[in-house]
From Swiss-Prot:
Coiled coil: none annotated. Binds 1 zinc ion per subunit. InterPro entries: aa-tRNA-synth_I_cd-bd (IPR045462), aa-tRNA-synth_I_codon-bd_sub2 (IPR020751), aa-tRNA-synth_I_CS (IPR001412), aa_tRNA-synth_I_cd-bd_sf (IPR008925), Glu-tRNA-ligase_bac/mito (IPR004527), Glu/Gln-tRNA-synth (IPR000924), Glu/Gln-tRNA-synth_Ib_cat-dom (IPR020058), GluQ/Sye (IPR049940). This is Glutamate--tRNA ligase. The gene is gltX. It comes from Salmonella typhimurium (strain LT2 / SGSC1412 / ATCC 700720).
């Protein structure tokens, strides 16, 4: 049997991390078994579905590189198919037309709740032989079995049983002729030959209803696996108050897709004590049996740690392709300065996100108009004039511009003036970067370049002279 899974989001908003984890688990299960992965857009909610949400879902899937083998399919383009199946069910007696008014149903609900009963349709039209005009408004309901139970072996949670007496006669077509969500899902899974449905635990109550419809259609019933929810670190359901929840927001915040995928796969699944997983390792090791039944807590610090790891272990050239977008967001002109792959090497240890890297690299490419006030006050003082003049002259004398020779020039300045490296290094750092923090000074000065470094030292000397004149 060929394994076939699907990810079926509703385009009523962005792709959130819970949906992304479900997509990842479905994708990994299919890839592990050499099967196929289908993308299906469940857009039957015409009022809330938007083109922008569809685009956001596709962007998120593409950014995570969760490629699909079939689709994207759109439910709104399959209404003829759904209605044809409903007509067949009406003919077969597994569905029936319901003419009950909204007022009657509301009164029925109120009466049942007053008696402490679970609100459900009472089956009036199921057993009615009244004649109705062809154009009289009605819905179509599924004739759910009235006895027995539905048992399915959840691939994560084990056997789950529902009594058919607890299940309603589900509406499968509205009065406007549009099919409903639970019915469309069933026909799609049947037509697309889905073998394993991996989805959130909020769908558990839908499963017995969908199984009953599949059986009424004499269609194969897939295996089901329901993944637990994701909570915030406070134990409450993950929401915007816990930080970003949209996949593309993590892109915007400077995370690499490898980091988010690695974090999401471990958010409810484990393989021993291993924390770092390549995509290939995920595919090889993933199994539904190792997925936890308990809710997972989202820990942003752990994700940040993983992101820092991947910034420093993936090929700098690859990281640079993702960094480019953030550089563009900061409007930095990188034509005069180090290659972005070199920048990744320079700033990787200091920066935990690509956004942070882009926001802290401008001095490598563009001149700054003023020095950081605190850094200048502390380090660009009259006592720094001589170290800056000496190191400037030694840097000017370098014929083979390299980080090693820059280091020798700084060290030689400290030796000549008989001062510690900090007495030379800190004023030099503020002079060439405009701030008090940077990567190692020799590689920083080397990356900024000889001409630009000397110009900035002269600017710092001018700043010191002006400061002296004001005292």
């Amino acid at each position: 049997m060929k394994i076939k899974t699907r990810f079926a989001p509703s385009p009523t908003g962005y792709l959130h991390v819970g949906g992304a984890r479900t997509a990842l688990y479905s994708w990994l299960f299919a890839r592990h078994h050499g099967g196929e992965f289908v993308l299906r857009i469940e857009d039957t909610d015409l009022e809330r579905s938007t083109p922008e949400a569809i685009e956001a879902i596709m962007d998120g899937m593409n950014w995570l590189n969760l490629e699909w083998d079939e689709g994207p399919y759109f439910q709104t383009k399959r209404f003829d198919r759904y209605n044809a199946v409903i007509d067949e069910m009406l003919e077969a007696g597994t569905a029936y037309k319901c003419y009950c008014s909204k007022e009657r149903l509301e009164q029925l609900r109120e009466d049942q709740m007053a008696k402490g009963e679970k609100p459900r349709y009472d089956g009036r039209c199921r057993h009615s032989h009244e004649h109705h005009a062809d154009d009289e408004p009605c819905v179509v309901r599924f004739a759910n079995p009235q006895d027995g139970s539905v048992i399915f072996d959840d691939q994560i949670r084990g056997p789950i049983e529902f009594s058919n007496q607890e299940l309603d006669d589900l509406i499968i077509r509205r009065t406007d002729g549009s099919p409903t969500y639970n019915f469309c899902v069933v026909v799609d899974d049947w037509d697309m030959e889905i073998t394993h449905v991996i989805r959130g635990e909020d769908h558990i109550n839908n499963t017995p209803r969908q199984i009953n419809i599949l059986k009424a259609l004499n269609a194969p019933v897939p295996m089901y696996a329901h993944v637990s929810m994701i909570n915030g670190d406070d134990g409450k359901k993950l929401s915007k108050r816990h930080g970003a929840v949209s996949v593309m927001q993590y892109r915007d915040d400077g995370y690499l897709p490898e980091a988010l995928l690695n974090y999401l796969v471990r958010l409810g699944w484990s393989s021993g004590d291993q924390e770092i997983f390549t995509r290939e390792e995920m595919i090889k090791l993933f199994s539904l049996g190792a997925v936890s039944k308990s809710a997972s807590a989202f820990n942003t610090d752990k994700l940040l740690w993983l992101n820092h790891h991947y910034i420093n272990t993936l090929a700098p050239e690859y990281v640079a392709t993702h960094l480019q977008w953030h550089i563009e967001q900061e409007n930095i002109d990188t034509r005069n300065g180090p290659q972005l792959a070199e920048l990744v090497k320079l700033l990787g240890e200091r920066c935990k996100t690509l956004k942070e890297m882009a926001q802290s690299c401008r001095y490598f490419y563009e001149d700054f108009s003023e020095f950081d006030a605190d850094a200048a006050k502390k380090h660009l003082r009259p006592v720094a004039r001589q170290p800056l003049e000496v190191v400037r002259d030694k840097l000017s004398a370098i014929t083979d511009w390299s980080a090693e020779n820059v280091h020798h020039a700084i060290q030689a300045t400290a030796d000549e003036l008989e001062v510690g490296m900090g007495k030379v290094g800190m004023p030099l750092r503020v002079a060439v970067t405009g701030a008090g923090q940077s990567p190692a000074l020799d590689v920083t000065v080397h990356a900024i370049g000889k001409t630009r470094s000397i110009e900035r030292i002269n600017k710092a000397l001018g700043f010191i002279a002006e400061r002296e004149s004001q005292q």
